[in-house]
Amino acid sequence: MTQSVPAIFLDRDGTVNVDHGYVHEIDNFQFIDGVIDACRELKEMGFALVLVTNQSGIARGMFTEEQFLSLTEWMDWSLADRGVDLDGIYFCPHHPDGSVAEFSETCECRKPLPGMLLQAQNELNIDMAASYMVGDKIEDMQAALAANIGTKVLVRTGKPVTAEGEAAADWVLNSLADLPKAIKARYK
């Protein structure tokens, strides 16, 4: 059996890109400063990069799954063009109060539940204890806890950081851009 690898699990909106609210078009997608360089450095450090994102706008009828997939393909290519290959992309299109019947449900994949993270663990052979979850909301931290991810990192680039969010996180950083330096400092 191949050796498991550590991963950086990344929330999307507010962590990788500026959260303009239900981002689903290329014209509205803006990488947060320093994120691409940080992702490249994290890959060089031996981490798998795994995107895990709730996309309730699909269930709410704000955009289609096809629109989301088109934007995701563009984002993936944009990162690859800059030397960053994502190892996995997982998304939850569901919401219990959705207006699109096929996606209006309570599921196991929507954060704070750990479904997407556990699916990635199984498919990519991830060492969860050596991994990091990076997100801008308490739900990201709760999903990481439920999936037994070693380090929960809350970033200030998205939703306002709450006391509950800080308490649920192991680290609070200004941005994903600060993560490589923080990890290196941990192992000095």
UniProtKB/Swiss-Prot annotation:
Residues that hold substrate according to the record: 11-13, 19-22, 53-56, 110-111, 137
Keywords: Carbohydrate metabolism, Cytoplasm, Hydrolase, Lipopolysaccharide biosynthesis, Magnesium, Metal-binding, Zinc
Protein EC: 3.1.3.82
Active site: 11 (nucleophile), 13 (proton donor)
Chain sites annotated for binding Zn(2+): 92, 94, 107, 109
UniProt-annotated binding residues for Mg(2+): 11, 13, 136-137
Site label Stabilizes the phosphoryl group, positions: 53, 111
GO molecular function: D-glycero-beta-D-manno-heptose 1,7-bisphosphate 7-phosphatase activity; magnesium ion binding; zinc ion binding
Chain segments annotated as transmembrane: none
InterPro entries: HAD-like_sf (IPR036412), HAD-SF_hydro_IIIA (IPR006549), HAD_sf (IPR023214), Heptose_bisP_phosphatase (IPR004446), Histidinol-phos (IPR006543)
CDD domains, per database record: HAD_HisB-N
Subcellular location: Cytoplasm
Gene Ontology cellular-component annotations: cytoplasm
Cofactor(s) needed for function: Mg(2+); Zn(2+)
Recorded superkingdom: Bacteria
Root EC class: hydrolase
Catalytic activity: D-glycero-beta-D-manno-heptose 1,7-bisphosphate + H2O = D-glycero-beta-D-manno-heptose 1-phosphate + phosphate
Pathway recorded for this protein: Nucleotide-sugar biosynthesis; ADP-L-glycero-beta-D-manno-heptose biosynthesis; ADP-L-glycero-beta-D-manno-heptose from D-glycero-beta-D-manno-heptose 7-phosphate: step 2/4; Bacterial outer membrane biogenesis; LPS core biosynthesis
Residues annotated as site: Contributes to substrate recognition: 110
Record-level GO BP terms: ADP-L-glycero-beta-D-manno-heptose biosynthetic process; lipopolysaccharide core region biosynthetic process
Family per record: Belongs to the GmhB family.
Assembly description: Monomer.
Name of the protein: D-glycero-beta-D-manno-heptose-1,7-bisphosphate 7-phosphatase
Protein source organism: Yersinia pestis
Upper taxonomic lineage: Bacteria, Pseudomonadati, Pseudomonadota, Gammaproteobacteria, Enterobacterales
Protein's gene: gmhB
